[in-house]
Amino acid sequence: FKKVYFCLQIYSFKEMNELEFQKDITLIAAASDNHALGKDNQLIWHISDDLKRFKRLTSGHAIIMGRKTFESMPKALPNRKNIILTRNRSYQALDAFVAHTIEEALSLAADDPQPFIIGGGEIYSLFLPLADTLELTRVHGHFEADAFFPKIDPQNWKLVAEEKHAASQDQDF
């Protein structure tokens, strides 16, 4: 296994979004320097500290994800309102809500002032123009992938916090 260092980056949108949903829509992801997220519907790495951070930040909140992301998990994530965005009108999921449009997904998250968008690549691209905050773990390295995080335009986003971490024994790649 390859050990690499990573850094946590928090970005805020520089100006108000065109479509204001009265929410702090937050994209949360771990992506490599080449924007890789996953391959074959699985995460490329396992970084224990980052998974704990994900759990801490998203617990008690609505989480919006694509169908493939939901199906990559053994079950709906506990202590969260799981919302699946899919084009499949007949899709059903145990312990989760199903939406077919961005507006429908946000409507299902109406009771949460800070819903989290948790993937995958297509879903991040759909919600990036609506997001207020990016909680991004940048895994340093280039990885082969088939799902990617969208590029962040520095004209629109401002880095407001960064925390660097060295490689540790609890990382699997």
Positions of predicted regions on the chain:
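Extreme N-terminus of proteins, especially the signal/transit-peptide cleavage junction
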Residues: 16-24
